């Protein structure tokens, strides 16, 4: 569960290291975001010569949460850290590589690019 002020790791090579959630998109007064939800983030830490810099406000999709996701068979997939992939205005990933595993819940029409770039799909 990601809410406002939550700090997330960045799971791509866009140049950002950590981001902070400033808004959960998708409805007024929506409080929490889970895996596959789009949030508005600000870059808190970035590497030199990256595609984004500190202070940039971009969209991101949540790919890993400590809360995890419950499957239809009753199993739960949890991760050690919260992580997101940064998106441009067309909802496409800014980076060209994805680090770490992602879940099968991202397998929708708009996030197939992330699924194909990910090294492991759980």
From Swiss-Prot:
Disulphide bonds in the chain: none
The GO terms describing molecular function are: large ribosomal subunit rRNA binding; structural constituent of ribosome
Q: Which InterPro entries match?
A: Ribosomal_uL14, Ribosomal_uL14_bac-type, Ribosomal_uL14_CS, Ribosomal_uL14_sf
* One Pfam family matching this protein: Ribosomal_L14
Q: Name one GO cellular component term.
A: cytosolic large ribosomal subunit
Gene3D superfamilies in the record: Ribosomal protein L14
Q: Which PROSITE patterns match?
A: RIBOSOMAL_L14
Example GO BP = translation
Q: Which CDD domains match?
A: Ribosomal_uL14 (cd00337)
Keyword Glycosyltransferase present in the record's keywords: the answer is no
Is rRNA-binding one of the keywords? Answer: yes
Keywords in alphabetical order:
Ribonucleoprotein, Ribosomal protein, RNA-binding, rRNA-binding
- Per the similarity annotation, which family is this? Belongs to the universal ribosomal protein uL14 family.
* HAMAP family named in the record: Ribosomal_uL14
Functionally, this protein is described as follows: Binds to 23S rRNA. Forms part of two intersubunit bridges in the 70S ribosome.
The protein's name: Large ribosomal subunit protein uL14
Q: Read off the lineage from the record.
A: Bacteria, Pseudomonadati, Pseudomonadota, Gammaproteobacteria, Alteromonadales
């Amino acid at each position: 569960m990601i809410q406002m002020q939550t700090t997330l790791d960045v799971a791509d090579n866009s140049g950002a290291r950590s981001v902070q959630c400033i808004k959960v998109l998708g409805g007024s007064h929506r409080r929490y975001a889970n895996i596959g939800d789009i949030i508005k983030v600000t870059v808190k830490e970035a590497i030199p010569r990256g595609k984004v810099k500190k202070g940039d406000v971009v969209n991101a999709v949540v790919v890993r949460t400590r809360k995890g996701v419950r499957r239809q068979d009753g199993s739960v997939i949890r991760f050690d850290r919260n992580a997101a992939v940064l998106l441009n205005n067309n909802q496409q990933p800014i980076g060209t590589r994805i680090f770490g595993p992602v879940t099968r819940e991202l397998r929708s029409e708009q996030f197939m690019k992330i699924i194909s770039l990910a090294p492991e799909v759980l």
